[in-house]
Amino acid sequence: MKKHLLMVAMAFAMSTQAATTQPERVAATQLKPIAAQTQAAVWASRVMGRYHYKATPLDDAMSEKIFDKYFESLDGEKLFFVQADIDKFAPVRDKLDDAINNENLTIPFSIYSVYQARFAERIGHARELLKTKMDFTVDESMQLDREKAAWPKDDAEMKDLWRKRVKNDWLRLKLAGKEDKAIRETLDKRYDNYQTRVRK
């Protein structure tokens, strides 16, 4: 728990900001940290470093752990970020400690903004796929548990991953006895609900 205290404080700070924003406007507005969120992150780092029974310094090593855990918490199944997104933020992987100590939460908020954009892109693509005819004559497979998978290398690989995911979702409902029209409506509503949740 001690290793995740700072992560929790940062997540809480971000969720507080998101909760005060109207859902319809989140996609068009880039989230920015407010003073209270910055102070919460600084406070958490000081508590971890000074008062916990086993002091955990907020240093470069801890920064790297926080960075990795943050991406894992946002996209543990590697369905939204591509490798280029990870590479883009890699130079600041060991600098979160400096950012927090300097009361600058731009990095985690920038990461979250990219996450929101990627989420909207992926779900939008999934909903477009529902308008096409599924081809079940092709012999192919997909990795269901992607926790240990590599990040998709590019947008083309990500789109193919989502094509297989939508096809799998469709097939499951088909095997449950649903007709194509009902499947399309069910999945469209499901994907829309995903998007609504991430906007809140």
Where are the regions that the model predicts?
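Gram-negative bacterial Sec-dependent N-terminal signal peptides
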Residues: K2-Q17
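Flexible, low-complexity junctional segments that flank or bridge functional domains
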Residues: H4, A18-K200
